[in-house]
């Protein structure tokens, strides 16, 4: 039996260590190879994407046109805007079911073939009506309108959140609500709170924004407004100051009034016409319900007419509590303030709270006293009464 010398033992130990080092190095290199292969695949995908993007950018622009008539599976009559009509081929990848008269399409420059279906064009004004940022008003910020809020939520919010309740009962949910009452009583505020609470598209428009100079422009805006609402359903449309376009129609009218009447008739057709409206709810607000056209007020268009009156004593007290909850009050009797502000609107009460705070700031105080509120009541309501007296006397003098 041979015995290894000391040098041989040392060499064998170095050899084993070297083998271990090589194995570890091989594993490291294999890991690097896998990482490089993954990077290569990623870069190849990026290269393919960039080549595809370059190919799309190199494509010549297409003409925009409108389908006039679909002849068969492969051909259609199209019209370039304000230009001649062409009988063209339809690309095989186009969904024939979506091609209808009036559909906007992209046409190839050389062959005029239909190569793409374009979305419906909309006036930028209509797109601007959509409310992107939700108002920060909640139901808790509204005082004295519990009954009105309940009726509004039942008609608009409940069908959007729990449509199954109406299906079980076997009734159709209300389609529209009209809020009417004196100025400053919270009609727009209720709509803002509803927009904050519901998970639906909210479109706000003032009635006067739908009035246009040229014939048919206002009616077109109304049509595009409801088309946008249908596309983004569930949707709530809030029309503020609807009396601007919803006044009673007269026999003798000027050119401008006839255009307003055309806009109103388009609104009537959109709200309850031949085509179904879908999951689109309409809320309108006005200070003048007496001048609205009767066709606008019938069920099917506005199923609920909600009066938003001047607040009573309890309502005024609730409104004062809402507007003073962040104020530092010292010795203030809100019940007494509510009693002496009979006939005041919610806007008046907010102005009173603001003026009371201004009186405190004027005297370099961080708290508000009863005396501040008394002076604020006299300033806000006293000025209003004087202004009304001046207007009345002016009408008496000048007719």
Swiss-Prot record:
GO annotation terms (biological process): proteasomal protein catabolic process; protein unfolding
Gene Ontology CC terms, in alphabetical order: cytoplasm; proteasome-activating nucleotidase complex
InterPro entries: 26S_Proteasome_ATPase, AAA+_ATPase, AAA_lid_3, ATPase_AAA_core, ATPase_AAA_CS, NA-bd_OB-fold, Nucleotidase_PAN, P-loop_NTPase
TM segment ranges: none
Listed PROSITE patterns: AAA
Residue ranges, annotated region (Docks into pockets in the proteasome alpha-ring to cause gate opening): 397-399
Gene3D superfamilies hit by this protein: 1.10.8.60, 1.20.5.1700, Nucleic acid-binding proteins, P-loop containing nucleotide triphosphate hydrolases
KW Transmembrane helix (keyword) present: no
GO molecular function per UniProt: ATP binding; ATP hydrolysis activity
NCBIfam families linked: PRK03992.1 (NF003069), proteasome-activating nucleotidase (TIGR01242)
Family per record: Belongs to the AAA ATPase family.
UniProt remark on domains: Consists of three main regions, an N-terminal coiled-coil domain that may assist in substrate recognition, an interdomain involved in PAN hexamerization, and a C-terminal ATPase domain of the AAA type.
Function: ATPase which is responsible for recognizing, binding, unfolding and translocation of substrate proteins into the archaeal 20S proteasome core particle. Is essential for opening the gate of the 20S proteasome via an interaction with its C-terminus, thereby allowing substrate entry and access to the site of proteolysis. Thus, the C-termini of the proteasomal ATPase function like a 'key in a lock' to induce gate opening and therefore regulate proteolysis.
Protein name per the record: Proteasome-activating nucleotidase
Organism in which the protein naturally occurs: Pyrococcus horikoshii (strain ATCC 700860 / DSM 12428 / JCM 9974 / NBRC 100139 / OT-3)
């Amino acid at each position: 039996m041979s015995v290894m010398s000391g040098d041989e033992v040392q060499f064998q130990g170095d050899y084993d260590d070297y083998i271990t080092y090589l194995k570890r190095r091989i594993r490291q290199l294999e890991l690097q190879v896998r990482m490089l292969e993954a990077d290569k695949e990623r870069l190849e995908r990026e290269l393919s994407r960039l080549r595809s993007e370059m190919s799309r950018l190199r494509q010549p622009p297409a003409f925009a046109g409108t389908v006039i008539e679909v002849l068969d599976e492969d051909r259609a009559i199209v019209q370039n805007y304000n230009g001649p009509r062409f009988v063209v081929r339809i690309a095989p990848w186009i969904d024939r079911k979506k091609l209808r008269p009036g559909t906007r399409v992209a046409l190839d420059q050389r062959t005029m073939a239909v190569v793409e279906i374009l979305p419906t064009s909309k006036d930028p004004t209509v797109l601007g009506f959509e409310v992107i940022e939700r108002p920060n008003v909640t139901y808790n910020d509204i005082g004295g309108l519990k009954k009105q809020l309940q009726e509004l939520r039942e008609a608009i919010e409940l069908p959007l959140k729990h449509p199954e309740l109406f299906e079980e009962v076997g009734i159709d949910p209300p389609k529209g609500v009209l809020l009417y009452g004196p100025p400053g009583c919270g009609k727009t505020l209720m709509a803002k709170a509803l927009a904050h609470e519901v998970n639906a598209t909210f479109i706000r428009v003032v009635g006067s924004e739908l009035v246009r100079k040229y014939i048919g422009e206002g009616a077109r805006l109304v049509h595009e407004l409801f088309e946008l609402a249908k596309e983004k359903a569930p949707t709530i449309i809030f029309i503020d100051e609807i009396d601007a376009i919803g006044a009673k129609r007269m026999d003798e009218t000027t050119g401008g009034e006839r255009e307003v009447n055309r806009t109103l008739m388009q609104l009537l057709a959109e709200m309850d016409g031949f085509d179904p409206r879908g999951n689109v709810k309409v809320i309108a607000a006005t200070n003048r319900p007496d001048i609205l056209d009767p066709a606008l007020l019938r069920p099917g268009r506005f199923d609920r007419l909600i009066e938003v009156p001047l607040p009573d004593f309890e309502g005024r007290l609730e409104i004062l509590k809402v507007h003073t909850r962040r104020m530092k009050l010292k010795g203030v009797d809100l019940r007494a303030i509510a009693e002496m502000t009979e006939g005041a609107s919610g806007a008046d009460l907010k102005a009173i709270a603001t003026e009371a705070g201004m009186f405190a700031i004027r005297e370099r105080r961080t708290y508000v006293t009863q005396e501040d509120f008394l002076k604020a009541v006299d300033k806000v309501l006293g000025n209003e009464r004087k202004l009304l007296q001046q207007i009345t006397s002016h009408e008496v003098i000048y007719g």
